Amino acid sequence: LAYAIKDMAEKYSNSQLEILYETQNIQRYDQDFEIKLHNIIQELINNTLKHSEATTASILLVEKDEKLLLSIKDNGKGFDKLQVPKKDGLGINQIDARIHMMKGEFSIDSKNNIGTSITIELPVLKKETLNFF
């Protein structure tokens, strides 16, 4: 997962947007869990590229106390969550639903002309250890 985030940050960084990333205490997790989380991060970065007009974004992923904490921030134009048209909010609603299915929490803080901060907290689903005895 840490390598996937590094690749994603490098792949999506361009002349208009620099994506910084940091991972702390990240290990291998259940494969399905990793795929779901990777897809969520990818969708959020795509939203940043598509809507934010940001010049800098950051991805922070930390494992602490059996939880994964994900923070994605940008310095873009921000938005008023109440003013987002239903069709434009579908991606966010789907992400929220996926996170809740993973028994996690999702929050967005966005301010016009300051940027957006997204926080996700998920219980860790570790790779199963096989016991042959």
What are these regions (language model features)?
Residues 1-133:
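Coiled-coil dimerization/phosphotransfer module
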